[in-house]
Amino acid sequence: MEKNKYIYGASIQGIQGFIFSTNSLKDIVGGSELVEKICTTLFESNYLQGGTSIINAAGNIKCVYDDLQECEKTVLEFPKTVMLAAPGITISQAVVKVTEEELKTHFASCMDLLEKKLKIQRNKPARSMTVGFMGVERSRTTGLPAITQESQEYLDEGTLKKRELSIGGKATIALAEKSFGLKDLSPKNIALDIKRLTENNDWIAIIHADGNGLGQILSKFSSSMEKLKDFSEKLNQATCQAARAAFKKVYTAEDYTQDSSIFPFRPVVLGGDDMTMICKASLALDYVKVYLEEFENATRQKLGAENGLTACAGIAFIKSSYPFHYGYDLAETLCTQAKIVSKNPLIQKDAKNAPSSVMFYKVQAAS
Protein backbone atom coordinates (compact mmCIF):
# COMPACT_ATOMS: atom_id res chain seq x y z
CA MET A 1 0.00 0.00 0.00
CA GLU A 2 1.40 3.37 -1.03
CA LYS A 3 2.18 5.72 1.82
CA ASN A 4 0.48 9.12 1.96
CA LYS A 5 2.20 12.47 2.39
CA TYR A 6 0.69 15.68 3.77
CA ILE A 7 1.65 19.05 2.31
CA TYR A 8 1.12 21.72 4.96
CA GLY A 9 0.93 25.43 4.18
CA ALA A 10 0.59 28.43 6.48
CA SER A 11 0.22 32.10 5.60
CA ILE A 12 0.78 34.64 8.34
CA GLN A 13 -1.43 37.71 7.94
CA GLY A 14 -1.43 41.18 9.42
CA ILE A 15 2.37 41.35 9.59
CA GLN A 16 2.78 45.00 8.61
CA GLY A 17 -0.18 46.12 10.70
CA PHE A 18 1.33 44.34 13.70
CA ILE A 19 4.80 45.80 13.18
CA PHE A 20 3.65 49.38 12.49
CA SER A 21 0.83 49.55 15.04
CA THR A 22 2.69 52.31 16.95
CA ASN A 23 5.16 55.09 16.14
CA SER A 24 7.68 53.82 18.68
CA LEU A 25 10.82 52.56 16.96
CA LYS A 26 11.60 50.11 19.75
CA ASP A 27 8.16 48.55 19.29
CA ILE A 28 8.73 48.31 15.53
CA VAL A 29 12.11 46.69 16.24
CA GLY A 30 10.48 44.13 18.54
CA GLY A 31 7.62 43.51 16.11
CA SER A 32 9.95 42.78 13.21
CA GLU A 33 12.02 40.43 15.37
CA LEU A 34 8.87 38.61 16.52
CA VAL A 35 7.73 38.03 12.93
CA GLU A 36 11.20 36.80 11.98
CA LYS A 37 11.15 34.42 14.95
CA ILE A 38 7.69 33.02 14.10
CA CYS A 39 8.65 32.20 10.52
CA THR A 40 11.95 30.55 11.45
CA THR A 41 12.96 29.29 14.87
CA LEU A 42 9.48 29.08 16.43
CA PHE A 43 8.11 26.81 13.71
CA GLU A 44 11.29 24.81 13.17
CA SER A 45 11.88 24.02 16.84
CA ASN A 46 8.29 23.04 17.66
CA TYR A 47 6.57 21.73 14.54
CA LEU A 48 9.07 20.54 11.96
CA GLN A 49 9.82 17.18 13.60
CA GLY A 50 8.94 14.52 11.09
CA GLY A 51 8.50 17.11 8.36
CA THR A 52 10.58 18.45 5.48
CA SER A 53 10.70 22.21 5.02
CA ILE A 54 10.07 23.65 1.55
CA ILE A 55 9.57 27.39 2.10
CA ASN A 56 10.09 29.25 5.33
CA ALA A 57 10.31 33.02 4.78
CA ALA A 58 8.38 36.28 4.56
CA GLY A 59 5.28 34.99 6.35
CA ASN A 60 4.94 31.84 4.25
CA ILE A 61 5.57 28.35 5.58
CA LYS A 62 5.31 25.17 3.54
CA CYS A 63 6.48 21.70 4.49
CA VAL A 64 5.70 18.03 3.86
CA TYR A 65 4.80 15.64 6.68
CA ASP A 66 5.14 11.86 6.50
CA ASP A 67 2.98 11.32 9.56
CA LEU A 68 -0.68 12.40 9.80
CA GLN A 69 -0.50 12.90 13.56
CA GLU A 70 2.41 15.35 13.26
CA CYS A 71 0.49 17.29 10.62
CA GLU A 72 -2.67 17.36 12.76
CA LYS A 73 -0.65 18.56 15.75
CA THR A 74 0.69 21.49 13.71
CA VAL A 75 -2.76 22.44 12.39
CA LEU A 76 -4.24 22.37 15.90
CA GLU A 77 -1.43 24.02 17.87
CA PHE A 78 0.54 26.36 15.60
CA PRO A 79 -2.14 29.11 15.32
CA LYS A 80 -2.37 29.32 19.11
CA THR A 81 1.42 29.42 19.38
CA VAL A 82 1.55 32.29 16.87
CA MET A 83 -1.24 34.29 18.53
CA LEU A 84 0.36 33.89 21.97
CA ALA A 85 3.79 34.88 20.68
CA ALA A 86 2.52 37.85 18.66
CA PRO A 87 -1.01 38.94 19.71
CA GLY A 88 -2.67 40.67 16.76
CA ILE A 89 -1.30 38.40 14.05
CA THR A 90 -3.58 35.82 12.43
CA ILE A 91 -2.72 32.72 10.46
CA SER A 92 -4.36 30.76 7.64
CA GLN A 93 -3.61 27.06 7.13
CA ALA A 94 -4.31 24.38 4.55
CA VAL A 95 -3.30 20.76 3.96
CA VAL A 96 -3.21 18.67 0.79
CA LYS A 97 -3.12 14.88 1.09
CA VAL A 98 -1.12 13.18 -1.68
CA THR A 99 0.60 9.89 -2.42
CA GLU A 100 4.37 9.61 -2.75
CA GLU A 101 3.97 9.14 -6.49
CA GLU A 102 1.78 12.24 -6.83
CA LEU A 103 4.29 14.26 -4.82
CA LYS A 104 7.06 13.27 -7.22
CA THR A 105 5.24 13.47 -10.55
CA HIS A 106 2.62 16.19 -9.97
CA PHE A 107 4.32 18.41 -7.39
CA ALA A 108 3.44 21.67 -9.18
CA SER A 109 -0.26 20.74 -9.32
CA CYS A 110 -0.20 19.82 -5.62
CA MET A 111 1.29 23.21 -4.74
CA ASP A 112 -1.30 24.99 -6.88
CA LEU A 113 -4.06 23.17 -5.00
CA LEU A 114 -2.46 24.15 -1.68
CA GLU A 115 -2.36 27.81 -2.75
CA LYS A 116 -6.04 27.69 -3.75
CA LYS A 117 -6.96 26.26 -0.35
CA LEU A 118 -4.85 28.89 1.43
CA LYS A 119 -6.55 31.64 -0.56
CA ILE A 120 -9.96 30.37 0.56
CA GLN A 121 -8.82 30.30 4.19
CA ARG A 122 -7.35 33.82 3.97
CA ASN A 123 -10.76 35.12 2.90
CA LYS A 124 -12.41 33.74 6.03
CA PRO A 125 -12.48 36.36 8.80
CA ALA A 126 -10.52 35.40 11.90
CA ARG A 127 -11.90 36.14 15.34
CA SER A 128 -9.84 38.82 17.08
CA MET A 129 -8.10 37.66 20.25
CA THR A 130 -7.33 41.22 21.39
CA VAL A 131 -10.71 43.01 21.47
CA GLY A 132 -11.26 42.84 25.24
CA PHE A 133 -14.27 43.90 27.28
CA MET A 134 -15.81 47.34 27.72
CA GLY A 135 -14.67 49.24 30.77
CA VAL A 136 -11.08 47.95 30.81
CA GLU A 137 -8.02 50.19 30.66
CA ARG A 138 -6.54 50.45 27.18
CA SER A 139 -3.21 51.30 25.60
CA ARG A 140 -3.15 54.93 24.48
CA THR A 141 -1.16 54.06 21.34
CA THR A 142 -2.94 50.96 20.02
CA GLY A 143 -6.37 51.15 21.66
CA LEU A 144 -6.08 47.52 22.75
CA PRO A 145 -6.74 46.24 26.30
CA ALA A 146 -3.83 46.98 28.63
CA ILE A 147 -2.35 44.18 30.70
CA THR A 148 0.41 46.09 32.51
CA GLN A 149 1.74 49.57 33.21
CA GLU A 150 5.28 50.90 32.73
CA SER A 151 5.83 54.30 34.33
CA GLN A 152 2.82 56.28 33.07
CA GLU A 153 2.27 54.09 29.99
CA TYR A 154 -0.33 51.34 29.69
CA LEU A 155 0.81 48.44 27.49
CA ASP A 156 -1.29 45.89 25.64
CA GLU A 157 -0.07 42.31 25.31
CA GLY A 158 1.32 42.72 21.78
CA THR A 159 3.34 45.81 22.70
CA LEU A 160 4.67 44.07 25.80
CA LYS A 161 5.88 41.12 23.71
CA LYS A 162 7.62 43.53 21.33
CA ARG A 163 9.32 45.39 24.20
CA GLU A 164 10.56 42.16 25.74
CA LEU A 165 12.27 41.24 22.47
CA SER A 166 13.50 44.70 21.49
CA ILE A 167 15.36 45.58 24.66
CA GLY A 168 18.61 43.64 25.01
CA GLY A 169 19.49 40.12 23.98
CA LYS A 170 20.72 38.57 20.74
CA ALA A 171 17.23 38.49 19.22
CA THR A 172 17.28 42.28 19.07
CA ILE A 173 20.06 42.35 16.49
CA ALA A 174 19.48 39.09 14.57
CA LEU A 175 17.68 40.77 11.66
CA ALA A 176 20.18 43.64 11.64
CA GLU A 177 23.12 41.22 11.36
CA LYS A 178 21.39 39.45 8.47
CA SER A 179 20.69 42.74 6.70
CA PHE A 180 24.08 44.37 7.26
CA GLY A 181 26.36 41.35 6.90
CA LEU A 182 28.15 42.24 10.13
CA LYS A 183 28.77 39.84 12.99
CA ASP A 184 28.81 40.50 16.71
CA LEU A 185 26.77 43.70 16.55
CA SER A 186 26.11 45.43 19.82
CA PRO A 187 22.62 46.56 20.86
CA LYS A 188 24.24 50.01 21.00
CA ASN A 189 24.41 49.95 17.18
CA ILE A 190 20.62 49.63 16.85
CA ALA A 191 18.49 52.74 17.33
CA LEU A 192 15.51 52.20 19.62
CA ASP A 193 14.53 55.87 19.45
CA ILE A 194 13.68 57.52 16.14
CA LYS A 195 15.65 60.64 17.16
CA ARG A 196 18.82 58.55 17.34
CA LEU A 197 18.14 57.34 13.79
CA THR A 198 17.67 60.81 12.28
CA GLU A 199 20.23 62.76 14.34
CA ASN A 200 19.56 66.49 13.74
CA ASN A 201 17.38 65.94 10.67
CA ASP A 202 13.79 64.91 11.40
CA TRP A 203 13.19 63.28 7.99
CA ILE A 204 13.17 59.51 7.61
CA ALA A 205 12.47 57.17 4.70
CA ILE A 206 10.44 53.97 4.65
CA ILE A 207 11.59 51.70 1.82
CA HIS A 208 9.70 48.72 0.43
CA ALA A 209 11.15 46.62 -2.40
CA ASP A 210 9.68 43.58 -4.14
CA GLY A 211 10.86 41.32 -6.97
CA ASN A 212 9.39 41.42 -10.49
CA GLY A 213 8.10 38.46 -12.47
CA LEU A 214 8.51 35.98 -9.64
CA GLY A 215 5.50 33.92 -10.76
CA GLN A 216 6.98 33.32 -14.22
CA ILE A 217 10.33 32.18 -12.84
CA LEU A 218 8.70 30.15 -10.06
CA SER A 219 6.92 27.94 -12.60
CA LYS A 220 10.32 26.72 -13.81
CA PHE A 221 11.28 25.52 -10.34
CA SER A 222 7.95 24.01 -9.22
CA SER A 223 8.39 20.63 -10.86
CA SER A 224 9.79 19.03 -7.70
CA MET A 225 10.03 19.69 -3.98
CA GLU A 226 13.83 19.76 -4.10
CA LYS A 227 13.90 22.35 -6.90
CA LEU A 228 11.37 24.62 -5.19
CA LYS A 229 13.20 24.41 -1.87
CA ASP A 230 16.52 25.16 -3.56
CA PHE A 231 14.98 28.10 -5.44
CA SER A 232 13.44 29.51 -2.25
CA GLU A 233 16.74 29.29 -0.37
CA LYS A 234 18.75 30.87 -3.20
CA LEU A 235 16.24 33.69 -3.68
CA ASN A 236 16.38 34.42 0.05
CA GLN A 237 20.20 34.41 -0.10
CA ALA A 238 20.17 36.78 -3.08
CA THR A 239 17.86 39.23 -1.29
CA CYS A 240 20.05 39.21 1.82
CA GLN A 241 23.19 39.57 -0.31
CA ALA A 242 21.73 42.63 -2.06
CA ALA A 243 20.78 44.25 1.26
CA ARG A 244 24.25 43.65 2.70
CA ALA A 245 25.98 45.03 -0.39
CA ALA A 246 23.79 48.15 -0.37
CA PHE A 247 24.44 48.79 3.32
CA LYS A 248 28.20 48.38 3.02
CA LYS A 249 28.49 50.52 -0.11
CA VAL A 250 26.31 53.36 1.16
CA TYR A 251 27.33 53.42 4.79
CA THR A 252 31.09 53.12 4.31
CA ALA A 253 30.95 56.73 3.11
CA GLU A 254 30.07 57.73 6.68
CA ASP A 255 32.66 57.46 9.42
CA TYR A 256 31.61 55.06 12.12
CA THR A 257 32.98 52.62 14.64
CA GLN A 258 31.09 49.39 15.13
CA ASP A 259 31.64 49.57 18.87
CA SER A 260 29.66 52.73 19.45
CA SER A 261 27.93 54.11 16.33
CA ILE A 262 24.17 53.90 15.89
CA PHE A 263 23.49 52.79 12.33
CA PRO A 264 21.03 55.06 10.46
CA PHE A 265 19.20 51.96 9.15
CA ARG A 266 16.63 49.72 10.78
CA PRO A 267 15.58 46.63 8.81
CA VAL A 268 11.96 45.62 9.28
CA VAL A 269 11.42 42.71 6.85
CA LEU A 270 14.02 40.81 4.83
CA GLY A 271 13.16 37.49 3.23
CA GLY A 272 11.95 35.88 0.03
CA ASP A 273 12.02 38.72 -2.50
CA ASP A 274 10.78 41.34 0.01
CA MET A 275 12.72 44.06 1.79
CA THR A 276 11.37 46.76 4.09
CA MET A 277 13.73 49.25 5.71
CA ILE A 278 13.52 52.43 7.78
CA CYS A 279 16.49 54.74 7.37
CA LYS A 280 17.74 58.31 7.45
CA ALA A 281 16.15 60.10 4.51
CA SER A 282 19.42 61.31 2.97
CA LEU A 283 20.64 57.72 2.47
CA ALA A 284 17.48 56.19 1.00
CA LEU A 285 17.91 56.79 -2.74
CA ASP A 286 21.56 55.70 -2.76
CA TYR A 287 20.68 52.59 -0.77
CA VAL A 288 17.82 51.62 -3.10
CA LYS A 289 19.91 52.21 -6.24
CA VAL A 290 22.62 49.83 -5.03
CA TYR A 291 20.07 47.32 -3.69
CA LEU A 292 18.24 47.04 -7.02
CA GLU A 293 21.52 46.64 -8.94
CA GLU A 294 22.84 44.03 -6.52
CA PHE A 295 19.52 42.15 -6.48
CA GLU A 296 19.77 41.70 -10.24
CA ASN A 297 23.40 40.58 -9.98
CA ALA A 298 22.79 38.23 -7.05
CA THR A 299 19.77 36.49 -8.61
CA ARG A 300 21.66 35.97 -11.88
CA GLN A 301 24.58 34.56 -9.94
CA LYS A 302 22.53 32.17 -7.80
CA LEU A 303 19.65 31.25 -10.13
CA GLY A 304 21.46 31.37 -13.46
CA ALA A 305 21.76 34.19 -15.99
CA GLU A 306 18.52 33.20 -17.74
CA ASN A 307 16.59 33.21 -14.44
CA GLY A 308 17.81 36.53 -13.05
CA LEU A 309 15.17 38.78 -11.51
CA THR A 310 14.63 42.51 -11.33
CA ALA A 311 12.88 44.43 -8.56
CA CYS A 312 10.95 47.62 -7.92
CA ALA A 313 10.97 49.81 -4.84
CA GLY A 314 8.88 52.54 -3.26
CA ILE A 315 10.25 55.18 -0.89
CA ALA A 316 8.06 57.27 1.40
CA PHE A 317 9.89 60.30 2.81
CA ILE A 318 8.11 61.32 6.01
CA LYS A 319 8.67 63.25 9.21
CA SER A 320 9.49 61.02 12.16
CA SER A 321 6.21 62.05 13.83
CA TYR A 322 4.14 60.95 10.82
CA PRO A 323 2.26 57.66 11.48
CA PHE A 324 4.51 54.82 10.38
CA HIS A 325 1.68 52.61 9.13
CA TYR A 326 0.61 55.35 6.70
CA GLY A 327 4.22 55.72 5.61
CA TYR A 328 4.54 52.00 4.97
CA ASP A 329 1.24 51.88 3.06
CA LEU A 330 2.53 54.73 0.89
CA ALA A 331 5.87 52.97 0.25
CA GLU A 332 4.06 49.75 -0.69
CA THR A 333 1.69 51.63 -3.03
CA LEU A 334 4.63 53.41 -4.67
CA CYS A 335 6.34 50.05 -5.20
CA THR A 336 3.19 48.68 -6.84
CA GLN A 337 2.94 51.72 -9.10
CA ALA A 338 6.61 51.38 -10.06
CA LYS A 339 5.88 47.80 -11.13
CA ILE A 340 2.92 48.92 -13.27
CA VAL A 341 4.98 51.59 -15.01
CA SER A 342 7.92 49.21 -15.55
CA LYS A 343 5.63 46.67 -17.25
CA ASN A 344 4.45 49.25 -19.78
CA PRO A 345 5.32 47.82 -23.24
CA LEU A 346 6.94 51.12 -24.22
CA ILE A 347 9.35 50.76 -21.30
CA GLN A 348 9.85 47.00 -21.06
CA LYS A 349 10.06 46.62 -24.86
CA ASP A 350 11.50 43.18 -25.70
CA ALA A 351 13.11 42.55 -22.31
CA LYS A 352 12.17 39.32 -20.55
CA ASN A 353 11.64 41.08 -17.22
CA ALA A 354 10.33 44.54 -16.42
CA PRO A 355 13.28 46.83 -15.62
CA SER A 356 14.13 47.64 -12.02
CA SER A 357 12.72 50.99 -10.99
CA VAL A 358 11.96 53.13 -7.97
CA MET A 359 9.15 55.58 -7.22
CA PHE A 360 9.26 57.98 -4.28
CA TYR A 361 7.15 60.67 -2.64
CA LYS A 362 7.83 63.24 0.04
CA VAL A 363 4.94 63.86 2.43
CA GLN A 364 4.99 67.61 3.06
CA ALA A 365 1.79 67.83 5.10
CA ALA A 366 2.01 67.97 8.87
CA SER A 367 1.39 64.76 10.78
Regions found by a protein language model. Name each.
Residues 1-367:
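Regulatory and interdomain segments flanking nucleotide-handling catalytic cores
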